[in-house]
A protein has these predicted regions:
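Conserved N-terminal Rossmann-fold NAD(P)-binding element of oxidoreductases
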Residues: 6-10
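N-terminal Rossmann-fold NAD(P) dinucleotide-binding loop
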Residues: 15-16
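N-terminal Rossmann-fold cofactor-binding loop
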Residues: 32-36, 55-56
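Conserved Rossmann-fold cofactor-binding substructure of NAD(P)-dependent oxidoreductases
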Residues: 55-68
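N-terminal Rossmann-like NAD(P) cofactor-binding module of classical short-chain dehydrogenase/reductase
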Residues: 66, 70-75, 95-97
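ADP-ribose/adenylate-binding Rossmann-like module
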Residues: 87-105
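Rossmann-fold NAD(P)-binding glycine/threonine-rich loop
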Residues: 99-121
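Rossmann-like dinucleotide-binding core of oxidoreductases
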Residues: 117-193
Length: 193
């Protein structure tokens, strides 16, 4: 069996670490972006990588790319994930995204599970990594017989003091539109419970 193939959709700010990680571990990687030069920069001449042009507005162009891979990772803006998920479902491909699960993505996730596919969402720093690391800590404390009296998690693009040079006091590591949309999402927390 050959190397697993992964399609990365988008060559924005969060793509570089993922592309590098996958290539260093022997995966074949296709980076699809509207700006091929950015995808090429991410591949950086690696023999197991390939950069291709992809315009998300032409979603049918995704099908031949999906036909080549085992897994798609959508790093596109969150409002594009549903279109990608529909294509992955039609072509029986697993999907990973970094965004919250919208009702439409939830419905497609149920269909994917019924088809034996994994649609894994919320795998970004906001919200995924902080959730996973929190659960790891909580599980460890409970396994050692401890009890959680309180837990607070602060996560995001908080810059070092010397780099805190803008009115937002924030450093964009992902699409600014996505940051603004996420900032308007409702929040919930559990306190004293």
């Amino acid at each position: 069996m050959g190397a697993k193939k992964v399609l990365i959709l988008g060559a924005g700010l969060v793509a570089r670490p993922m592309v590098r990680y996958l290539l260093e571990r022997g995966f074949e990687v296709i980076v699809a972006s509207r700006t091929v030069s950015r995808a090429e920069a991410l591949i950086d001449g690696h023999p197991a990588g390939r950069a291709v042009a992809f315009q998300v507005e032409q979603i049918e162009a995704l099908d031949p790319l999906l036909a080549e891979v085992d897994l798609a990772v959508s790093l596109l803006p969150a409002h594009r994930h549903v279109e990608v998920a529909r294509r992955c479902l039609a072509l029986q491909r697993h999907l990973v995204t970094t965004s919250y699960v919208s009702p439409a993505m939830g419905d497609l996730g149920d269909q994917a599970a019924a088809a034996g596919l994994l649609f894994l969402n919320e795998c970004g720093l906001d919200p995924g990594i902080d959730h996973m690391s929190a659960m790891q800590d909580i599980d460890r404390v409970k396994a050692d017989g401890g009890r959680i009296a309180g837990f607070t998690s602060w996560c995001g693009g908080l810059p070092a003091a010397e780099a805190n040079d803008n009115p937002w006091h924030y450093k964009f590591s992902w699409a600014p539109r996505g940051v603004l949309v996420a900032a308007t999402n409702p929040a919930a927390w559990l306190e004293d419970g």
